[in-house]
UniProtKB/Swiss-Prot annotation:
Cofactor(s) listed in the protein's UniProt record: pyridoxal 5'-phosphate
Species in which this protein is naturally found: Burkholderia thailandensis (strain ATCC 700388 / DSM 13276 / CCUG 48851 / CIP 106301 / E264)
Listed name of the protein: 2-aminoethylphosphonate--pyruvate transaminase
EC assignment: 2.6.1.37
InterPro entries the UniProt entry points to: Aminotrans_V_dom (IPR000192), NH2EtPonate_pyrv_transaminase (IPR012703), PyrdxlP-dep_Trfase (IPR015424), PyrdxlP-dep_Trfase_major (IPR015421), PyrdxlP-dep_Trfase_small (IPR015422), SP_NH2Trfase/AEP_transaminase (IPR024169)
Record bears the keyword Transferase: yes
Catalytic activity: (2-aminoethyl)phosphonate + pyruvate = phosphonoacetaldehyde + L-alanine
Keyword annotations of the record: Aminotransferase, Pyridoxal phosphate, Pyruvate, Transferase
Assembly with partners or alone: Homodimer.
GO molecular function: 2-aminoethylphosphonate-pyruvate transaminase activity
Gene that this sequence comes from: phnW
The family this protein is said to belong to: Belongs to the class-V pyridoxal-phosphate-dependent aminotransferase family. PhnW subfamily.
Gene Ontology terms describing biological process: organic phosphonate catabolic process
Annotated TM spans: none
Amino acid sequence: MPERDPILLTPGPLTTSRMTRDAMLHDWGSWDAAFNRLTKSVCADLVRIAGGGDAYVCVPLQGSGTFAVEAALGTLVPRDGRVLVPNNGAYCARIAKILRRLGIAHSELPFAEDEPASAQAIDAALARDARITHVALVHLETSAGLLNPLDDIAAVCRARGKALIVDAMSSFGALPIALAGSGIDALISASGKCLEGVPGMGFVIARRAPLEAAEGRSPSVVLDLHDQYAYMQRTSQWRFTPPTHVLAALRAALDQFFDEGGQPARGARYAENCAALVDGMRALGFEPFLDARAQASVIVTFHAPADPAYAFAAFYAAVRDAGYVLYPGKLTTADTFRVGCIGALGAHEMRGAVAAIGGALRALGIAMR
């Protein structure tokens, strides 16, 4: 018998459903009318999930979600613009790195890795520096599982007349987001996250007005979001070879998303997964890194055992042998590891993961208390 695939307790790639995987068993012609209809239907549904309405358009891009982040920043921020980056983790820092590489003026507003970005502090930073034109916010900082207060920060940006670009990579589909009336210029996510597709396609749900004003602004050809948008409007096609199988899988994943009950049901399942995980891990002696008020139900960071017998590589391997894949820590201030709560999983799989982690502790002689 073939070996069973391990259960991925990661923030993407994820464990996917059989229906999603089966959707990739068919080949598509990239210029064929049927594939063009597939692209159109997926983009329309992504705008629908985001609550965007006619003022927004979805522009898909080949590659990981970070490709789409760089495309949005390089296309939507004018050359004389300046970006404020609230920074409480590795993915916020990545935005700052992209801006440096693009030569876009920016400033960082630092927060601790366990501290949600403060709308009041952002408001004060905007008041201090009138040169700032944009705020680039990570909605859910995946390095810790930290949720930043999107609605409060969007309200500040609206009041100050600043454009807001949101990296919603690990929140879109799981947490409520309503673009209409929000003042958000762009929301960025990817196929292989909370929509439970496979990796390979990022997308930007952008407000039409600033996108249409951005012709010729991007320093890149392949990451020119305006050019991708304009070409798709003219031809219904992608500029370059599209990830056909990824898109077909995402179509199947979206069908399942709506059948489940959309974002409220998806978010409720992930919350149940998170509760089962945290309760079980606490029973083993683990403590989450974040306070419960800042914790999103997508991925949980746990403090590593203090026992000298603990080494992440051996711990990971022991849990992997039991059929579960963990995620390493990404914090600078604490020794941690991460466990994802998303994918085609339920509380049963989370309890199985806890049992596997307990077995690994016993096998490796790691004491928790």
